[in-house]
């Protein structure tokens, strides 16, 4: 029996959630499965993956083949690297201690990368918010200046003529 690790769709249209499952390759996408390994939510930024890594690793070592999307998710979580290292240990190319050391180094590097990416995303959002706020303040100041000029014109026609000359003078100097 050919066993696949794949995504099983659930949720609703335009807001799909996926279960990461082990199933027979001949069964339909949302049909019967052997075991549920976790969930995948692509609607969040970054995508949320809840996965039982040890159980998934056991299935991969037993010969379950992941689909392309499932392989990407498993690679992101380190299951495929762990399999690669374990195959090296089984063949005698490296020792278990070296494999564990390489895997833990990869995990720490991955965590640092995730943290820096999350911080960059937060700082970008903050910078965008500040830029929008500054643009809004400029627009409000311009509107307030227009309202003030209209009040002056309505209250005192002589001052309005002086105001018109004051605004025309900088325009003429610029030309």
Curated annotation (Swiss-Prot):
Gene symbol of the encoding locus: rpsP
Protein name: Small ribosomal subunit protein bS16
Alphabetical list of NCBIfam families matching this protein: PRK14521.1 (NF011094), S16 (TIGR00002)
InterPro entries for this protein: Ribosomal_bS16, Ribosomal_bS16_dom_sf
A single MF term (Gene Ontology): structural constituent of ribosome
The entry's keywords: Ribonucleoprotein, Ribosomal protein
Ribonucleoprotein as UniProt keyword: yes
A UniProt-annotated Pfam family: Ribosomal_S16
Family: Belongs to the bacterial ribosomal protein bS16 family.
Cellular component per GO, a single term: small ribosomal subunit
HAMAP family noted in UniProt: Ribosomal_bS16
GO biological process, one term: translation
Top-level taxon of origin: Bacteria
């Amino acid at each position: 029996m050919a066993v696949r690790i794949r995504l099983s769709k659930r949720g609703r249209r335009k807001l799909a959630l996926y279960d990461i499952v082990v199933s027979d390759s001949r069964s339909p996408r949302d049909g019967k499965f052997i075991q549920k390994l976790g969930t995948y939510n692509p609607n969040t930024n970054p995508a949320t993956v809840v996965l039982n890594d040890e159980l998934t690793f056991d299935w991969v070592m037993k010969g379950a083949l992941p689909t392309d999307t499932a392989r990407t998710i498993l690679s992101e979580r380190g299951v495929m690297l762990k399999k690669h290292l374990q195959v090296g240990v089984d063949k005698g190319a490296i020792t278990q201690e070296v494999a564990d050391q390489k895997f833990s180094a990869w995990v720490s590097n991955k965590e640092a990368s995730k943290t820096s990416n999350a911080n960059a995303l937060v700082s970008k959002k903050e910078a965008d918010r500040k830029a929008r706020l500054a643009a809004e303040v400029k627009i409000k100041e311009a509107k307030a200046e227009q309202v003030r000029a209209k009040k002056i014109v309505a209250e005192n026609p002589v001052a309005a003529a002086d105001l018109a000359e004051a605004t025309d003078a900088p325009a003429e100097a610029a030309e």
